C-alpha cells in the first residue's frame, strides 16, 4: 500500500513544518473524530485529521497525493469496506493512535510521529483487509 510508504513521511515532515495553528487544527480534528457516535461523522473528521497532517508538511506533492487519497476514500467500494470492518472499538483504537500521532507532532518528535503513523496505518489495513 503506497499510503503506508508516504504517510509516515508526511507525519515526519509535519513535525518540522507545522505551525502552532496547524497543530491546533490537527488536534481539533482528532477531538472531533473522537466525539462522533456514527461512522459518517467519524470518517469526515478522520479524513480531516489526515488531510491537515499533509497540509502541515507545506509540500505541494504530498498535498496532491492526499487529494487523490480523498477521492478514493469517497468511492462506494471503499465505503462498503469501511462499513463492514470499522467497528466502534476499532474507531476508538484509531482515535488512541491519532492522539499519539498528534502528540508526537506537537512535541516535535520526528521518529515518534513517523512510527506512530506507520503503526496506525498497519492497524487500519489489517482491520479492513483481515
Question: What are the roles of these predicted feature ranges?
Answer:
Residues 80-84, 88:
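Extended hydrophobic/aromatic segments used for targeting, binding, or gating
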Residues 1, 91-93:
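Short helix-capping and inter-helix turn/linker motifs at the boundaries of alpha-helical repeat units
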Residues 38, 89-90:
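Short coil/turn linker motifs that delimit alpha-helical repeat modules in TPR/alpha-solenoid proteins
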Residues 90-91, 111:
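Helix-centric, low-specificity signal for extended rod-like, repetitive segments
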Residues 104:
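Conserved, function-critical positions that sit in or immediately flank catalytic
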Residues 2-80, 97-100, 112-123:
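Conserved amphipathic alpha-helical segments that form helical-bundle/coiled-coil interaction surfaces
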Residues 122-130:
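Short arginine-rich
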